Design a protein with these regions (language model features):
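Acidic, low-complexity, intrinsically disordered interaction modules
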Residues: 17-71
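Mixed-charge, Lys/Arg-enriched low-complexity segments
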Residues: 1-20, 60-82
Length: 82
């Protein structure tokens, strides 16, 4: 899925549904790509991309957003060795 990034009013609901509330402050809202909300982790600088409606997770690869599982998405954000 290819989408242009739009920056506007932050939507924190997808993130709040995906991670414990104490971890939400570790992320910055970066914008939206279609229905996918983009968050960047303040320390690892990695993205957590979450569909605003379905809560599904995506990674950006080769110019497209590709659906991945929740565990893979969270591991990619928090794994400092990647």
């Amino acid at each position: 899925m290819k989408c242009e990034i739009e920056v506007g009013k932050p939507d924190w609901r997808p993130l709040e549904n995906a991670v414990p509330s104490e971890f939400c402050e570790d992320f910055m809202f970066m914008g939206k790509a279609g229905g996918i909300v983009l968050y960047k982790h303040r320390i690892t600088r990695r993205y957590l991309n979450i569909d605003a409606v379905t809560g599904k997770f995506y990674r950006y690869a080769n110019g497209e957003y590709v659906e991945i599982g929740r565990r893979q998405a969270l591991d990619s954000v928090y794994d400092h060795d990647q």
